[in-house]
Amino acid sequence: MAEKSFNLYRYSIPVDSQLILRDRFLKRREGLIVRVSCSRDGWGEIAPLPGFSEETLDQAQEQAIEWLTTWCNASCDAPRVPLDGTYPSVAFGISCAMDEMKGYLQAEGNYHTAPLCYGDPDELYAKLASMEGEKVAKMKVGIYEANRDGLIADMFLEAIPDLQLRLDANRHWSLEKALQFAAKVKLQHRKRIQFLEEPCKTQALSREFAVQTDIAIAWDESVREPNFCLEKEPHLSAVVIKPTLIGSIQRCTELINQAHSLGLKAVISSSIESSLGLSQLARIAQQYTPNVTPGLDTLDLMEYQVLRAWPSSDLPIVDLESEFITKII
């Protein structure tokens, strides 16, 4: 009979000094690395996102140790220990480790990313020229003036005729501001906006924005609200799934299947995980949303990769002996 074991590590990686989350600078990305073993190993990342996750890293660590200890004290063929009631980041990281250990998480990943739009359109065009499949990029809006955001989005769409844009407003706009944005985007360009995530402060205002502008919208923050119910709506084209903020792989696949049954696109997206977590998100995307470009273009915000390399990245990789990683158990 195989013996169970687990380890837990804590990492702290320097990030881009310009990274702002919810109006505050994030100087380091911190999280937990979990290893589980029962005949074979599985790894996962537990990394609550400051300002977005309901749980702190310390709370996640305490809960992860409790869950892993319970799991470890049972035999390998014992019924699965449920993840119900655990924090989203804990449920996601542990489910990744368990599915990897059991061989449920396929090895192949979708490493095509939607690059972030900023700077010179020619530089973005060079990135997109080498991409296979749909040429899609992402642009954050709502931080600067709505008029400015609209002009820049329209500039990219004008400069790159086959570009599809995904926009993310994080509920920053009033309806008036959102309409100011749309006014700067030419009518013929609006259909190449795949979706605008949560343009307004409420779902009702976002729906009204979509009706008035004919710009498709997507739910992101709404998915994580209590009693959220995904329904088919006239201008809703996608649901954005951030597993670190939502929960286990099983919970995420339920949402994916629900979206697909309604004819909606499901997009796996990053919560600024390390390369370990990002590579597992790429595998989840390939396994469950194989024809959709995931939103995972966040690794360059970091100064290092953790344990596993992201294909094509030349960032240095740190291992368990690194000064950036501390063993807890």
Swiss-Prot record:
Tell me which domain of life the UniProt entry assigns to the organism this sequence originates from: Bacteria
What residues sit in the active site?
140 (proton donor), 242 (proton acceptor)
- GO process annotations (BP): menaquinone biosynthetic process
Pathways involved: Quinol/quinone metabolism; 1,4-dihydroxy-2-naphthoate biosynthesis; 1,4-dihydroxy-2-naphthoate from chorismate: step 4/7; Quinol/quinone metabolism; menaquinone biosynthesis
Listed A to Z, the keywords are:
Lyase, Magnesium, Menaquinone biosynthesis, Metal-binding
Q: Which residues bind Mg(2+)?
A: 168, 197, 220
Which reactions are catalysed by this chain?
A: (1R,6R)-6-hydroxy-2-succinyl-cyclohexa-2,4-diene-1-carboxylate = 2-succinylbenzoate + H2O
Name of the top EC class for this enzyme: lyase
Q: Per its Swiss-Prot or TrEMBL entry, what cofactor is needed?
A: a divalent metal cation
InterPro entries according to UniProt: Enolase-like_C_sf, Enolase-like_N, Enolase_C-like, Mandelate_racemase_C, OSB_synthase_MenC1, OSBS_N
Q: Name one GO molecular function term.
A: O-succinylbenzoate synthase activity
* rRNA-binding found in the keyword field: no
Which PANTHER family does this chain map to?
O-SUCCINYLBENZOATE SYNTHASE, O-SUCCINYLBENZOATE SYNTHASE-RELATED
- What the protein does? Converts 2-succinyl-6-hydroxy-2,4-cyclohexadiene-1-carboxylate (SHCHC) to 2-succinylbenzoate (OSB).
Its family? Belongs to the mandelate racemase/muconate lactonizing enzyme family. MenC type 1 subfamily.
The record's annotation in NCBIfam families points to: menC_gam_Gplu, PRK05105.1
Q: What is this protein called?
A: o-succinylbenzoate synthase
What is the species listed in this Swiss-Prot or TrEMBL entry? Answer: Haemophilus influenzae (strain ATCC 51907 / DSM 11121 / KW20 / Rd)
Q: Which gene encodes it?
A: menC
